[in-house]
Amino acid sequence: MIVHSIMEHLILYTSPYPKTRIGRPHDGGYVTVTLPGTYDALLSGGIANDISFEEHFLQLHPIPCYAFDGTIAHLPHANPTITFVKKNLGDSNTDNTTNLHEYMEPYHDIFMKMDIEGHEFRVMPTLQHGLMKKIKQLVIEIHSPGDIRMFPEYFKGLSDIDNRKMFDMLQGINQTHTLVHFHANNGCKIQEIDGIRLPHVFELTYLRNDFVLEKRKNTESLPTSLDRRNIPQNEDYVLSGFPYSTA
């Protein structure tokens, strides 16, 4: 008997290329995949007080970089290789927000990093019409409705985001990209969806589908040896079984 679950949109696959960690050891660093070829731009949404990821990435790939954050006046420290845009990411272009379309248009092999406190549910659905295929690799932190409901004052303007909208967004990403890394943020709680444990906040790494010619489900339990605790003093969440691994 085949049991279908909305969690199938988070099925994790084995990366066909080696992984590495970029950025600082704990929160703010991410596991990425070392892909063949080059990138032509780094677009980074959500900066706050940390550009360790951007600086490390640009040492490896000296390309144009745009960093977006409307909640800060300037970068944590000056870096001439990073163009700072004082705007938040959203579903439209205003004086205070951008949907990234104009920044993506000139490029074809983008590395995108996004940690924008729930507003991923606004901007990502606007990228479907051809723009998603410009993203060679995507690292994104998902702030699930479970977390949004717990902290409504923090996640202002996002009360309409429910599990259906979250999984619709993930299903949309899966049309053009393959999920190859999952890490639970241990600074939050955990919930159950269809009887399956899902952290309130989690980090995902996707590869564009032309780099995944054969999809093989992940066989490792999580976290992996490359992962680091977001909050060093908290234990990491251990995840295995569907949809995380065959283990």
Predicted region positions:
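Short, polar loop motifs at secondary-structure junctions
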Residues: 49, 67-75
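Active-site regions of enzymes building and remodeling cell-envelope glycoconjugates
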Residues: 63-64, 79-88
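A general structural motif
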Residues: 38-39, 62, 107-111, 133-135
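Switch II (G3) loop of P-loop NTPases
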Residues: 114-119
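Short loop/helix-cap segments at secondary-structure boundaries that form the rim of catalytic
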Residues: 57-58, 73-82, 130-133
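Class I SAM-dependent methyltransferase core
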Residues: 44
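Rossmann-like AdoMet/SAM-dependent catalytic core
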Residues: 1-41, 50, 56, 85-86, ...
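Conserved beta-strand signature within the Rossmann-like core of class I S-adenosyl-L-methionine
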Residues: 112, 134-145, 149
